[in-house]
């Protein structure tokens, strides 16, 4: 039996998993959910890991291509409660927001500083372009990188105003879940796995304004593994909203923008859900588009 070396520990790789992506194998087979699934097409960087010293997108790496390579995930950085200097710097500089992309950010910085202990701001920017942060905490990330680089070189760092992030007086206390975010221990909804769980795939509207004429639920339900198709034909209308409950969970009657959810397909596996969602036939009647404020203000605008 072959093995993959993850965080200096060999993990058995079953033959049926050779074609599995490293991302799914880490998360589904071994519960290493610190590696996050963002776009799943190798673009956003949320799934970054270090392979033989270089940052790689685990969502597009097949397990069979990684035999004999050293792989580091966020779970392999800290030594017990002792954090890696990069993790410590992220804490000291208050980088974390939601924490979803934080593990990928940390690993990207670790690989950068191992290859280049004295990166310039331009080199930092170039290395960090591959990790998209939906919270936008890039300025603090830059400070954390500069601080970590200095510490790894045995130097003390202060910011451009001469402030030391390690000071006690006048400094902010870490958010309660900061360490869990920085180590990848914090779990998001998709990080939980349950016995007999089903997987869902959203189906999005293709048009900015259209009437929903029909959704072919029966044909989709006949596909392998499909358990349920949630749409206006199968589910009572449910309204949600932060102040007023005036927005349907899924489209009813018509769609009002490209990307509005028109259905959710549930199946036994993620692959079955994705395939069935791609085959779900939605029939639209196109309506006049309203693409500007001026158009929307016209009396009787659709």
Q: Residue spans of the language-model regions?
A:
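Signature of N-terminal electron-transfer/Fe-S-associated modules in redox systems
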Residues: 1-161, 179
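Flexible, low-hydrophobicity surface segments
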Residues: 150-302
